[in-house]
Each structure stands twice: as C-alpha cells, then as structure tokens.
C-alpha cells in the first residue's frame, strides 16, 4: 500500500446517489475566467455568472470532490447541481445565506 492510497471494492461507485439534482444554464458575463470548486455553494458564486439563482440555494456542482468547472468570458454552459447534504448549514462563502437551510 502506498501512503494515501485508497483501495475500493471492485465495480463502480455511484456518487451522490439518491440526492436531488437540477440542471442550470450558466453564462459568464464578466471579462475574466471564473472557476467554481466542487463544494462551493452555487447560489453564492461570482455575480458575473448569470443564471436563475433562487433554485440553486442549497446546491453545489455534481462533480467529484476536489475538481472544478471553469467558465471563460462569454462562455455559456449547462451544469448539474446536487443538494448539499449533512446538516445543510450554509455559512461563509459570500455571506448571502449564513443559516441552516430547511
């Protein structure tokens, strides 16, 4: 075994199984690239990203941990979001929520 190595069972592992997801079309209206990490509360991302925000409250990108999605200036793409699990307490980020979600 190598330090830090993870040995999993044979077969596929389904990420975020059973959690609610939504599809959102996002456009970068800014003049600089914007990168969003896997566990950032999507509702609170950079204001230069244009999309319908309210449905994204309590959601994050449905991508593997430690990865990110990059939006170049003028880019428009569809992303899948997944509900944040655990205690569903959202604090920090851009301080738009700072409370436990319902």
Curated annotation (Swiss-Prot):
Localization terms from the record: Cytoplasm
Subunit structure: Heterotrimer of UreA (gamma), UreB (beta) and UreC (alpha) subunits. Three heterotrimers associate to form the active enzyme.
Pathway field: Nitrogen metabolism; urea degradation; CO(2) and NH(3) from urea (urease route): step 1/1
GO biological process, one term: urea catabolic process
Catalytic activity: urea + 2 H2O + H(+) = hydrogencarbonate + 2 NH4(+)
NCBIfam families the UniProt entry points to: PRK13203.1, urease_beta
HAMAP family: Urease_beta (MF_01954)
Protein name, as recorded: Urease subunit beta
Gene3D superfamilies in the cross-refs: Urease, beta subunit
